[in-house]
Amino acid sequence: MSARRYLCSELISLRINAIDAMVNLEEIWDRGAVFEAEKPIPEGARVEMRTAQALFAGKIIRVEQHEFGWRFEVEFSPLTPWSADQFLPRHLLEVSERKVEQK
């Protein structure tokens, strides 16, 4: 069974190897998230996403450069999985079960 994935758009403070950086949270699911940043972040770096209610720890497993910056995927630790009960990003849209209508 695949995890429910959600699109979102929210500025987040992400601690990367003990340094705080502002990044944009683009997508989230129970085991991970995708972020956008203006500067590169090394693959394998340990990160913490802190919100007012919770902390999600993990590591960067993929980094891609694109026209406007850097996109990277974080795999959350099994000890800190994401749930909407702990942190609900603004502009959340579930995409895992959306189907496009054919005309």
Describe the role of every protein-language-model region.
Residues M1-K103:
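Structured alpha-helical
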